[in-house]
């Protein structure tokens, strides 16, 4: 008897779990070239402030070992690279080769070449020994994970005892008027902007849908609290449009 394969969300649609990673990869292959430009335009540059706050919340020590997970084009890696010394290092890991290539070029153009390593891998199966990293940071990548519980378990394994996980992710606006404006802008403007700038209407349509179905800050905090992590907390930024979650391995 043929076993029916489990389905998972892909924006507002459902696809086979085995297909989602390749579909996500196709999306980022399509948008990688204009990815940074679109981030600036879509957020009016505010994403830079969000990422600065995220790095500040990490309280980076110069000799930390940090995993920038789902690193994309390297905005977080670039910020962190200025804060570590010769004893510390950063691993920039992403499943998408094109995004990692842009990341590497961006870091090198910034003048930083030491103590940064680039790895293409699936975050469900992190290719590291246990208890390596002082912190793991996921910036706008968590909602794209297919098996979130597996990813959290994998992250937990590679963190040192006392290490922390930080997640910056889109969330739910706290105020009704902001929610209405945000929804109108997201659904009616962002896909059209994506089409004009990068020629990828449907990639940015998926982006908006993935944000909409992502758990609220309270629900994600509960997911983290019910996992192996401890002391889960979050802060809202920009009226809850995004939130930073922080939890620890003890």
Curated annotation (Swiss-Prot):
Source taxon at top rank: Bacteria
Pfam entry (one): Ubie_methyltran
Residues binding S-adenosyl-L-methionine, per UniProt: 73, 94, 122-123, 139
Keyword ATP-binding annotated: no
Keywords noted in UniProt: Menaquinone biosynthesis, Methyltransferase, S-adenosyl-L-methionine, Transferase, Ubiquinone biosynthesis
GO molecular function, one term: demethylmenaquinone methyltransferase activity
Pathway info: Quinol/quinone metabolism; menaquinone biosynthesis; menaquinol from 1,4-dihydroxy-2-naphthoate: step 2/2; Cofactor biosynthesis; ubiquinone biosynthesis
SUPFAM superfamilies tied to this protein: S-adenosyl-L-methionine-dependent methyltransferases
Annotated GO biological process: aerobic respiration; menaquinone biosynthetic process; methylation
Enzyme class: transferase
Keyword Transferase: yes
Annotated catalysed reactions: a 2-demethylmenaquinol + S-adenosyl-L-methionine = a menaquinol + S-adenosyl-L-homocysteine + H(+); a 2-methoxy-6-(all-trans-polyprenyl)benzene-1,4-diol + S-adenosyl-L-methionine = a 5-methoxy-2-methyl-3-(all-trans-polyprenyl)benzene-1,4-diol + S-adenosyl-L-homocysteine + H(+)
Regions crossing the membrane: none
EC code(s) of this entry: 2.1.1.163, 2.1.1.201
Main function: Methyltransferase required for the conversion of demethylmenaquinol (DMKH2) to menaquinol (MKH2) and the conversion of 2-polyprenyl-6-methoxy-1,4-benzoquinol (DDMQH2) to 2-polyprenyl-3-methyl-6-methoxy-1,4-benzoquinol (DMQH2).
Family: Belongs to the class I-like SAM-binding methyltransferase superfamily. MenG/UbiE family.
NCBIfam families xref list: MenG_MenH_UbiE
HAMAP family according to UniProt: MenG_UbiE_methyltr
Protein's name in the database: Ubiquinone/menaquinone biosynthesis C-methyltransferase UbiE
Organism: Wigglesworthia glossinidia brevipalpis
